[in-house]
Amino acid sequence: MSSKKINPMREISIKKLSIHICARESGAKLDRAAKVLEQLTGQKPVTSKARMTIRNFGIRRNEKIAVHVNVSGKKAYELLNTALRVKEYELKESCFSNNGCFGFGIEEHIDLGLKYDPNIGIFGMDFFVILARPGDRVSKRKRCKSRVGNKQRVYAEDAKKWFVENFEGVLVE
């Protein structure tokens, strides 16, 4: 056998894909943004509140200004593939963080294959991908919490390599 065996505990997978739309105001615009996310994922989105008042933008503290959805499993791979197709499978190296996560934005949701509805309008959105290896839950669970070793963590280089291998992506400087 010439093929090298791979340790299943070292394989990297998507822990979750977070899709975020900031409407910058509560009310009808936020509801329309929530409708777009619901059409895209089939899940009910959650609203996010502003942390502080920014007078120049007209945002008050605790005002609902954004919606987001967390997707995991097979659906996360499908949505990520669709979003990367819009970006032509090219990401900047600065999109990757040191802890193995990466994110990028899309300017128009109609590029993802959703039909344009004049009542909704056009929204841009951000995609954040959190990568993990098996055993990551050890550091998150409530009972018998422990540290994850350095070999088991996902770093920026691992995330870049995973992106290039799984999606045949291109890293741009």
Swiss-Prot record:
Keywords annotated in UniProt: Cytoplasm, Nucleus, Ribonucleoprotein, Ribosomal protein, RNA-binding, rRNA-binding
Q: PROSITE patterns recorded for this chain?
A: RIBOSOMAL_L5
Tell whether Cytoplasm is among the UniProt keywords: yes
Single GO cellular component term: ribonucleoprotein complex
- Offer one example of a GO biological process linked to this entry: translation
Recorded hits in InterPro entries, A to Z, give:
Ribosomal_uL5 (IPR002132), Ribosomal_uL5_C (IPR031309), Ribosomal_uL5_CS (IPR020929), Ribosomal_uL5_dom_sf (IPR022803), Ribosomal_uL5_N (IPR031310)
- Intrachain S-S bonds: none
Q: Domain of life of the organism in this record?
A: Eukaryota
Molecular function as annotated in GO: rRNA binding; structural constituent of ribosome
User: Where is this protein localized, as stated in its record?
Assistant: Nucleus; Cytoplasm
Hey, which family's this protein in?
A: Belongs to the universal ribosomal protein uL5 family.
> Tell me, how does this one assemble?
Component of the large ribosomal subunit.
Q: Which NCBIfam families match?
A: PRK04219.1
Describe the task this protein carries out. Answer: Component of the ribosome, a large ribonucleoprotein complex responsible for the synthesis of proteins in the cell. The small ribosomal subunit (SSU) binds messenger RNAs (mRNAs) and translates the encoded message by selecting cognate aminoacyl-transfer RNA (tRNA) molecules. The large subunit (LSU) contains the ribosomal catalytic site termed the peptidyl transferase center (PTC), which catalyzes the formation of peptide bonds, thereby polymerizing the amino acids delivered by tRNAs into a polypeptide chain.
Q: What is this protein called?
A: Large ribosomal subunit protein uL5
What is the gene called?
RPL11
